[in-house]
């Protein structure tokens, strides 16, 4: 895991397996089926990294031989909240890693000015919960910021929110950091820039279209 000195709340997950799978996802010739499988696999690997610092406690366990105080995750419960629609493709990998997690959904699309328009919010109970928001891309950053706003308006502290994405543009990361410096952003790659259509360069195209086999 590395950091960029410009963005103190950005963490780049540079594990070789993550980078290998991301390269295949970038390839325009990768099929919808393979793209979907890779998204699940890479999200599982990234989920392993971002849950590294979960608080721990111990629980008395009887092994076949002795009783021990065994380490278990403490207190707070986990919730996975994909940002629709492309974020749905990431929830499977996270649920494979954390099958007991609750799942919410935040529906946001970008209007012609690339601003977020909210159309759905469904969340589990918020008390004593750690939230993992997920969306494959942080381009302008506005959708990510809006999704975090949804949780914070309901009383969730920034320290209890993480945002997981595959690729991000520096412009979007700056918007994210300015709005929510207390929320950690985890990505597989910090890409070069946004083009005139607000697409990440080099990016991986429209993640939702590639995931579901649709055309924009």
Curated annotation (Swiss-Prot):
Entry keyword annotation includes Disulfide bond: no
Matches recorded under Gene3D superfamilies: 3.40.50.2020
GO molecular function list: GTP binding; magnesium ion binding; uracil phosphoribosyltransferase activity
InterPro entries xrefs: PRibTrfase_dom (IPR000836), PRTase-like (IPR029057), Upp_B (IPR034332), UPRTase/APRTase (IPR050054), Ura_phspho_trans (IPR005765)
Cofactor list: Mg(2+)
The EC number(s) this enzyme carries: 2.4.2.9
Keyword list, A-Z: Allosteric enzyme, Glycosyltransferase, GTP-binding, Magnesium, Nucleotide-binding, Transferase
Positions annotated to bind 5-phospho-alpha-D-ribose 1-diphosphate: 85, 110, 135-143, 206
Tree of life domain: Bacteria
Residues annotated for uracil binding in this entry: 200, 205-207
Catalysis performed (reactions): UMP + diphosphate = 5-phospho-alpha-D-ribose 1-diphosphate + uracil
Cofactor note: Binds 1 Mg(2+) ion per subunit. The magnesium is bound as Mg-PRPP.
Protein activity control: Allosterically activated by GTP.
Gene Ontology terms: biological process: UMP salvage; uracil salvage
Pfam families reported for this sequence: UPRTase
Pathway: Pyrimidine metabolism; UMP biosynthesis via salvage pathway; UMP from uracil: step 1/1
Catalytic EC class: transferase
Family per similarity comment: Belongs to the UPRTase family.
Function summary: Catalyzes the conversion of uracil and 5-phospho-alpha-D-ribose 1-diphosphate (PRPP) to UMP and diphosphate.
Protein name: Uracil phosphoribosyltransferase
Species of the source: Paraburkholderia phymatum (strain DSM 17167 / CIP 108236 / LMG 21445 / STM815)
Encoding gene, per UniProt annotation: upp
């Amino acid at each position: 895991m590395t950091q960029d000195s410009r963005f103190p709340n950005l963490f780049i997950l540079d594990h070789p397996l993550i980078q290998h799978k991301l390269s295949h996802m970038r390839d325009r010739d990768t099929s919808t089926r393979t793209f979907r499988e890779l998204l699940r696999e890479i999200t599982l690997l990234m989920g392993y990294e971002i849950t590294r610092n979960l608080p721990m406690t111990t629980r008395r366990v009887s092994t076949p031989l002795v009783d021990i105080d065994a380490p278990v995750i403490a207190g707070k419960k986990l919730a996975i909240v994909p940002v629709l629609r492309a974020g749905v493709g990431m929830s499977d990998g996270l649920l494979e890693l954390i099958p007991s997690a609750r799942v919410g959904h935040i529906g946001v699309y970008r209007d012609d000015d690339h601003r977020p328009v909210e159309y759905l919010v469904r969340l589990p109970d918020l008390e004593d919960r750690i939230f993992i928001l997920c969306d494959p891309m942080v381009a302008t950053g506005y959708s990510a910021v809006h999704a975090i706003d949804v949780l914070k308006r309901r009383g969730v502290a920034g320290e209890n929110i993480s945002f997981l994405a595959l690729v991000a543009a520096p412009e979007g990361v700056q918007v994210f950091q300015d709005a929510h410096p207390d929320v950690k952003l985890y990505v597989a790659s910090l890409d070069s820039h946004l083009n005139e259509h607000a697409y990440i360069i080099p990016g991986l195209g429209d993640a939702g279209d590639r995931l579901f086999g649709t055309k924009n």
